[in-house]
Structure formats: structure tokens, C-alpha cells
């Protein structure tokens, strides 16, 4: 944040939900910088673009490796940006830099070595005929609301553009700022109000009528030469040797002769946690000034965050609902810092949590005062203090105690991970329902943004890995963004879980409109390989007269009719 602008580095799933909860002003976001084009970095971009458009921002510029624009091409039928111009700066271009009234930024592309080269596909095949379906025409009542798209075929070679694999480091230097004129010092030195103040403020020494010389340095605070901060990511070991030997980054290290002005105050690391512990990476970090603050934001290789998802609201409402039924609304097993735990703010290597703040100008350094802290008793007391709540709660408990179960079946079990909220907010996520058909056999109905995170938040990492490894199918009724934009993150999270649990689970059965192919294949060829993680069954194949049910599925699934959109395929699910 600055007084003039806000700059966003990476934009993972759940970004707009956190922005809404913590009152982050998206109206000031016009520049977004990406350290690597992985889903963990770009998964929140489609959703946050819609939010930025809604608050009236006319333009945003994406800085990163080539191919970022493909994300919006692939999503153009369900991410409708009529009033937002999205620009892309190829940060791998050696002539590219960024500069505005606040700072100058240099881009440092870092390529993997040959061992990190992505495998070539067997053939050069078209991704898919571009999807020109207007998914919003029925509800908006006007097909012209969505610009017509020219039907094309998007061709991709088996190899990605080599530059699209680049990781980006950003060296950011704030512009110098003159010291502030201190009025009390002017009075102390006998400077009368008037034009002489302006001369001193401009850095000019003056002579008073009595012949006394007053130096500008006597009455101004010191000039700020412009602090440096660096944002980096080393995605995996195939980048490591090139990363630690990158000359422009080494020039910033104290051990290599960097001056006080060039030494970064802060180094922000999006590097995976395990890789930051590699001896080469640790040695590289040790080259910076001893006072540099290393802010660690990376995930583990299993997709885990260092600590917490940063939302107090989900814990607050879960503690309050827990009062109604402790089994249906169990306490969440996540480990945000609980009230009373000590802060750890002295280490130069800091495991960052949401709202960790470092002030560069004026240089106040680290501030942890805004970091979310769980206060369970406060949330309970908040509910109990409501007029009439205790009496209503007691009546509910008595009613439940006398209730007769309508079934003794243990399954199916449903967990509502999201509801019909088309835009995520602090207490509601977008559409997703997890169904446990029998013990440790799951399917998912819809997969809105942040669904993977909701599963981890509800079950905790260990149990979530088991659940995801035993997830056999996902059903997506239609291609509104709030019903499927979390699918890529879920596919990757499931694969991490399979590897973690050493499961022999095969590809996920994906039941969805066939048009989803354009989105998924474009992502597969332009960003990361994901096609091996799923098998697509088109919803059209479930209609009566074709394939009434999927006999190989964990449940009997058939289609029904719907009026939500012309392309919606509702589902009738019958447990075996």
C-alpha cells in the first residue's frame, strides 16, 4: 500500500474473500505482479477481476511471464469483463521495467535448467474449438449482454513457450523523498514564517536578516533515499542453481559489496517451504544484510500454508453454530494464533500470516498488531449476550433430545462447503457440496473458488488428504464461474494428497458440460499439466435415451431438467 496506489503480488484462490473480510480496497489495485504462472499464484485472478470491475476500476495491468492473457481467453464465456481492460506486460522481456510516481521496479526472469523442461506431448493437437456459449443469456434476458465471440480453434504445440516457464523476481526501489520541514525547528532557529520556509523546504540554506545562516539540514528531517524491497519465487529445484547465481540479485547482497542504499530492507519469498530449507537457498539468504527481514509466504509441496488461512470470520461463525449442534458444526482444526499465544517477531526469517505488515516509509519495520488472533470465548459470549438467545438455545436442546430419528442410515453424509453465494464473502463461500456416499468414499457437487481450501479448513490437513485421496468424482451442473472455478486447485490438491497418502487412486471422474474442455485444455497447454488428473464425462451423455446412469460411478447419477440456464444439467443422485 501507498497513499496513491496498491500493488498486488500474486493472486491465489480465496483472495477476494480475504479482501472482503479485511476491507482491502480493491479499487486501488491497478497493477498485479506474478512471480510464476502456477494456479497457486493466479487462481484468484478471474474472481478478483470481476470484483475490481464491479468497483469501477477501468484498467488493470498484469506483469508476468508470457501467456497470462490466455487465462482470460479461456475464461471469456464465464468471466465477463465488459468494463475492465486487462493489459499484460511480458516481464521476461529484457527491455521491460515498471515505473510510476511511487517506485521503479526491475523484472528478473529466472529459467529452470534442462531437467525442469516440461515433457512434450505426443502430437501437436488443437486445444478445442473456442467456446462461444453465452452462459448468462437466460438470466440476463439479453444475449447481447455478452459480446459475441468469433469461433476459432486455438492451436498449441506440445511444448509450452519456454519463456512461459520463467519465474520472476522483482527488485523494487521507492523513489527518493525529501525530508520534511520541521516547523518547531524553524521557530527555534528564529526563521520567520513566509518565503524563507519554502526555500528551506526545497533544501536551500538561507541567511536571516540578522546575518545568521540557517542550514536546510538543521530544520528538515533527513532525506529518504528510497528503500529497496525484493519479491522472489524459486518454484522448484530445477530453478535453484539459476536462482542463487542470478547476478542482479547477488548485487543486492552485503557479502557481494552492496552498499547500505542497495541492501533490501525486506525480501519476500513465495518459494515453497521445503525449498527454502535447501542448503543452497539458505546460503543465498545469508548473503543479504543481517538486518534484512525475510518474509516467508510459500506453501509446502503438499499445498499447505505455513500457518492459517487468515480468516477469523469462519472461526467466529463456526464457534457460534457449534452452540446449536457440536456434531454438525465441529470446531475447525486450523491453527491460527489463539489469544494469549506469544508473538514471534524478532527472527529475521518470518513465517507470515495474514495482515503481517512491514512499514518501509516511514521506516517502522515489522508490525504484527493486525494479524488475526482467535478469541473463541469472545465469539461464544457474543451469541449468548443476544436477547433471548439462551432461552431459545435451551428450547432447541430439549426439542432435539426428544426428536425421533427418521432413519438409522449412517450415509450419505453431506458437508456444505459453499452455498448459492455467487460472490464469496467472509461467512459464505461459492457453491460446493461434499457427499460421503459410504465410509471414505466421496463425490463433490460443484466446485466454486476456494473449495480445496474449504475442505482443508474443515477437516485439517491430515484428514483432508485422506478425503481428497478418496474423492472419486466431481459433478458440475453448468459453467457459471461460481460453480467450477475451484476445479483446477482441487485437482492439484487431490494429486498432492494421493502422493502424500501413497494412494493408488486413479484420475478423478469429472461430470460436466463438455464446453469445460476449452477452459481446462487451455490451462493445461498454457500453464500447468492437469489433464492426467481427470477423466471427463460430458453431462449430455447422461440424458435419458443416451446413458441414463453411470454404472461405473460410486452412485447412480442421472440428469433432470432445469431452468437456471439453458445449459444447466441438474442431477439425481441415488446411493447404491
Model feature map: region roles:
Residues 1, 96-415, 422, 432-437, ...:
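Metal-dependent phosphodiesterase/nuclease catalytic metal-binding core
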Residues 1-58, 68-83, 186-192, 196-197, ...:
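Pre-active-site segment of Zn-dependent metallo-hydrolases
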Residues 24-27, 262, 466-469, 506, ...:
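Structured loop/turn residues at beta-strand edges in well-structured enzyme cores
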Residues 29-30, 58-61, 86, 265, ...:
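Residue-level recognition of the N-termini of beta-strands and the immediately preceding loop/turn
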Residues 59-67, 268-271, 292-300, 504-515:
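Short internal beta-strands
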Residues 80-94, 528-542:
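A glycine-rich helix N-cap at a beta->alpha junction
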Residues 450, 455, 516-517, 535-546:
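Eukaryotic, compositionally biased intrinsically disordered regions
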